[in-house]
Amino acid sequence: MGLVVMFIASWLAIFIFYSFQERLTILENAFVFLVSLTLVINASWIIAEELKLVELTKDGVAYTGFILNRSVGVPMIFVIAMNAVFRAKRVWTALASVAVVLAALVGLNGLGVYFEIAKYEKWNLGYDAISYAALLAIVYGLLRLYRKTVYRRTPS
């Protein structure tokens, strides 16, 4: 059941992104996706495999749900978040968008725990929220740096 839930969540993230009026260019969206994919994979590896704070399931089907969520769902949600943040005209709107995204990400992890995809040993959903907030801040900073570098005027 965990695979089905994570598949639907990933599919829903892709559909929302597709129907969302994009603020970022296709290159910026690809940059955000690839950077967030790299960060999320590394963070989940460190948390689960190196520090042993989370125990992942040994069931192959449920583990496929984890991989699908980690490799497609979460990076697509990060892309949606960056589009929403850069589209916001006010700071409060951007912060509300980030809060909704954090709630969705923590909710997905909560579903992962409920369907026994992951078992929290020395970890909880609050730590998930903090780590996702840090990852969102890093992606935001890297995207700002990318935009500054790409759109810099060259002297003529």
Model-derived regions: residue spans:
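Aromatic-rich, lipid-facing transmembrane alpha helices and their immediate juxtamembrane interface loops
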Residues: 1-156
